[in-house]
């Protein structure tokens, strides 16, 4: 509920989802917070209360899947107030091509400091864009960063309902625990994850400094005029 230029972050993220063109009735906020739930109700945002026992966002979506009747669930985290709606649409369209696949976003890492940053999950995948592994360590591990492409995770996911139900049956698995990356549970369960290239413009808001970065983007004259950042 932190405000960004006067608008609550969860509301901004919800607005990004609406800009994707997805039907409003199929977009909801899943939360274990009564404060967020009440805020959503006051602002006519469809929402659902989940258990405080959910250890990851994917566990939360899996709980929603048990309570609702959809075949595919797309998870955009609530701390993504300037997420590109074109990327949301891209993930939605890919679910039509791969309706039984788990889908996750990625983009190229263009700065060495981001490659070394342990807060950013790095991604390696096959020629067919199937996830091989993710790590908070720099992978592939090499000193020639400027000459070799590296990639990072973008935190938007698409899940078939059946995959979420299987995911929920297990507790955190070893690599998921050691890396603190929830998508690895699917890899450890020998389920494939299809990676899709997205833009690198989004900023996940984890600190007060991130709020300032987002406000700086929103205040730029050239983006005020566009629907992408309104």
Language-model features: where?
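Short, high-confidence coil segments that cap the C-terminus of an alpha-helix
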Residues: 24, 70, 98-100, 191
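Conserved alpha/beta core of the MobA/IspD/sugar-nucleotide pyrophosphorylase nucleotidyltransferase superfamily
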Residues: 148-230
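N-terminal glycine-rich phosphate-binding loop and ensuing alpha1 helix
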Residues: 1-28
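Short phosphate-binding loop-to-helix
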Residues: 28, 34-93
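Conserved core of the sugar-phosphate nucleotidyltransferase
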Residues: 84-173
């Amino acid at each position: 509920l932190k405000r960004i230029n006067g608008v609550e972050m969860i509301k901004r993220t919800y607005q990004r989802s609406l800009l994707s063109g997805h039907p409003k009735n199929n977009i909801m906020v899943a939360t274990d917070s009564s404060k967020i739930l009440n805020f959503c109700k006051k602002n006519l945002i469809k929402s659902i209360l989940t258990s405080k026992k959910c250890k990851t966002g994917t566990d939360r979506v899996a709980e929603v899947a048990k309570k609702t009747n959809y075949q595919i669930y797309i998870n955009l985290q609530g701390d993504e107030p300037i997420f590109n709606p074109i990327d949301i649409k891209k993930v939605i369209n890919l679910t039509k091509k791969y309706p039984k696949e788990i889908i996750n976003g990625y983009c190229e890492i263009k700065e060495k400091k981001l490659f070394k940053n342990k807060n950013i999950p790095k991604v390696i995948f096959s020629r067919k864009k199937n996830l091989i592994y993710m790590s908070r360590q720099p992978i592939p591990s090499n000193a020639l960063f400027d000459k070799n492409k590296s990639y990072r995770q973008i935190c938007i996911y698409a899940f078939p309902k059946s995959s979420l139900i299987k995911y929920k049956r297990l507790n955190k698995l070893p690599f998921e625990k050691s890396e603190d990356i929830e998508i690895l549970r699917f890899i450890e369960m020998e389920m494939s994850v299809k990676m899709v290239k997205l833009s690198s413009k989004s900023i996940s808001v984890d600190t007060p400094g991130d709020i300032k970065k987002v406000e700086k983007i929103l205040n730029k004259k050239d983006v005020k005029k566009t629907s992408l950042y309104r």
